[in-house]
Amino acid sequence: MENKDSLQFHMNMGKLISSVHNMITRRFVQNAHEAGLDISLDQWMVLGPIHYHGDASQKLLSDFCFKDKTSITRIVNTLEKKNLVVRVPDQLDHRVNRVILTTAGKQLFNDVLPIMNKTKKEVSRDIAESDIEIFKDVLTKIISNLENE
């Protein structure tokens, strides 16, 4: 019986988390496209830490975005092809590339901010801020539980 309950818990929780992620992603892309912007949520999530830090190593991006190095490389390659970022060698460690926003990347970041805020408002409509904080705390604890194994 315990195995059945565990499976049911995993399927319900995993399905809910996956569904929420997919729906938020679709809404963000829809809002961005309606505004005439060509950017995915993954690309936006990579632009954020680069903008915040001024530049970022691909390792930092991987850690920040909870994505493997291969996924980050693919996203950065796409952003580079769109002329939104450039890679430059780190001044102290030439084995490391720093990713920097171009002028077009900075402009896109600023153009997307209102879209992200709109999406955030749509996602959290009629949900108390305290409930959002509890939800984030629970998800953070789940992440911590799984990272510490």
Where are these regions (language model features)?
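Alpha-helical linker/hinge and terminal dimerization helices associated
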Residues: V20, I24-R27, N31, C65, ...
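Residue-level marker of regulatory loop/turn positions in helix-turn-helix DNA-binding domains and
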Residues: F9, I39, M116
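N-terminal helix-turn-helix DNA-binding core of bacterial DNA-binding proteins
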Residues: N22, R26-T70
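Charged, amphipathic alpha-helical coiled-coil/dimerization segments
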Residues: N77-D137
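C-terminal regulatory/oligomerization modules of transcriptional regulators
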Residues: M1-S6, E129-E149
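N-terminal leader segment of winged-helix/HTH proteins
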Residues: M1-A35
